[in-house]
Amino acid sequence: YEKNINIIMGNQIATSYVRKRDCYNQLKGFMQHEYPGKICALYGLRRTGKTVMMYQYISELSDKDKEKTVYILCLRECDMLELRQAMEDLYDKGVRNFFLDEITEVTDFQKYGNTFSDYFAAKGAKIVIAGTDSLGIMLAQSDILYDRIQMIHTSYIPFAEFSKLIENDSVDEYIEYGGTLTKSPYKTLQASEEYQNTAIVGNILHSLEKSEDARRYGAAITELYEQNELKSVLNKMINKFSYYTTVKAVNKCFKSAPLYSTIHNIQEPSYVSLINTEEANQATKNALGIKDLDEMQTSLSKRHLDELKNYLLELELFLEIPSYISLNSGERSEDLEIFMQPGMIYAHSTALIKNLADDSMWKDTCGIADRNLFILRADHFVKGILLENIILAETYKTFQKIDLDRYYVSQLSITLRNNNQHVEADMILVDKQKGESYLFEVKYSNQIVIDQTKHLRNTDFLEYIDENFGKVKSRLVLYTGASSKQNDVLYLNAATYLKRLSIVSNTPRPEIKQLLNENCNTSKPNLKTTSRKKPRKL
């Protein structure tokens, strides 16, 4: 079995990585406590620290415990029989801690993976697994490893953890590269596409193929459809987030010109077609093999489309956030969807914008005289949209963890019936137990601009919030400047806020006031009066 398995004993393992993932203590807890008949899985996308965590734990063991520990790297074409033989030989030699990396390369893992729990773990061995095709681990958890596995999720890397690990507090750094622990996946569009096609699309398809080989009944989705068709659909599902972000950013660049007027006269889902000119996205479509919408409609059934979308959710690629027009009456709005890899969206969106800027006909239509200025402005707006998404997603996940029944976090965009005003909040946080609401605007700017708070100062809007969500307790602007307070509106630095979220989420019985600390500079900076924001449609 040596040709398909690399075996490294614990006393041969060393690592130079000192800083640890926040979830490292979960791994440590599993290894140091008894969980009879259970194994542990590090579950997440590539380049989120799974292998490093294994190395870190092994390297910190005593010399005696290292002799009882092994790291096994499974190579392609390895099967469970070979792996079991290797593990039995090592067990007979006194090894009790098994770290099995790239477990999803084992061809029949989803058939016989319960060998780890039902045989080795039952004999007192500690087993930790990880794999590039992480969806395969999830599929095994729902089948042969049901109730036999403790999952440690690594895909989600919040800002506070990201900044700690790379020692950089820059919000820009997180927007441009957030999602993994290295810049390389999102440094260029080509690198981003390669990561998307291997870490995500390939992950799903490889896992499905191996899972369906293990099925005894039911239609196999990889047999019903061509591989390229499935690849196309998955990429389109992912890329819709980039297209939506790009269109919104370009919209914000224009206050006049034919395209801006046209965009504002049609429904939001349709205007993607106006900006996705052949010149703007052909390179991206070719690289990712994306088919046109009419071709897509004649291929996968709705049931199978929903199944693929669910796999993206299982990989923690995007977040669904419930949204209400009135929380008190229960009147719903369309749920929000936020993609959890900002670096991927940023790489795609900036490439699309540059392609647009190189289209002479498009530039003439839009009246773009300065290409570089357009790209600079559009980049600014892309980062603004992504900052909104980051703050909303992290706040939602934090308060779901604290008390999912007590707190409500979402966005709000409505037209008031009494005066037909369109009003909105980039984020609303409600403490349902206390009947209190907190309203937020999010700005990718270090300037305090009076117009930024026009919705927060709208008395009709505030009355609506009081009646439908809870009495407005505080109004805030999260931005990239220094914390300050202006006319009862608190300005908080976005990076500071995101770091506080991390602290609050790990504090017993936390209070919202810990997050919205008003002990800040109350001096009066030079105020600007120009800012305009296109209303968000939910």
Task: Give the positions of each predicted feature.
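Conserved P-loop NTPase "ATPase switch" module shared by AAA+ and STAND
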Residues: 91-110
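Sensor-1/coupling segment of RecA-like P-loop NTPase cores
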Residues: 119-141
